[in-house]
């Protein structure tokens, strides 16, 4: 794991162990936004994963999305370093298909 990924993981983990308890564990998604951002950074790197985490945090609000939202396995098509907003999913969730389908 690269140094930037380790630093991001340490910062997220510090937030989870300190401020998250003070703010309250009231995330509208599963996994929580901090766990989602940590997984996205570990899976896709600091640049792409950081943008994915930011998009998730922006969706987590009273009028945003809720429920199961997993980190995608592959980066979205059309995402590139010079178009960082394309890494994030700004609407909707990435949930598994219902069991009957």
From Swiss-Prot:
Keyword S-adenosyl-L-methionine: no
Topology versus the membrane: Peripheral membrane protein
Subcellular location: Cell inner membrane
Keyword Magnesium: no
GO cellular component, one term: plasma membrane
Chief localization: membrane
Keywords: Cell inner membrane, Cell membrane, Membrane
SMART domains: Haemolytic
Superkingdom field: Bacteria
Disulfide bonds: none
Family from the record: Belongs to the UPF0161 family.
Record's function text: Could be involved in insertion of integral membrane proteins into the membrane.
Name of protein: Putative membrane protein insertion efficiency factor
């Amino acid at each position: 794991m690269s140094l930037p990924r380790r630093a991001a993981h340490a910062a997220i983990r510090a937030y989870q162990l300190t401020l998250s308890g003070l703010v309250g564990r009231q995330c509208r998604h599963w996994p929580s936004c901090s766990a989602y951002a940590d997984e996205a950074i570990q899976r896709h790197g600091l640049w792409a994963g950081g943008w994915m985490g930011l998009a998730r945090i922006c969706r987590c609000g009273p009028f945003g999305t809720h429920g199961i939202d997993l980190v995608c396995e592959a980066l979205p098509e059309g995402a590139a370093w010079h178009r960082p907003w394309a890494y994030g999913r700004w609407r909707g969730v990435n949930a598994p298909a219902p069991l009957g389908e």
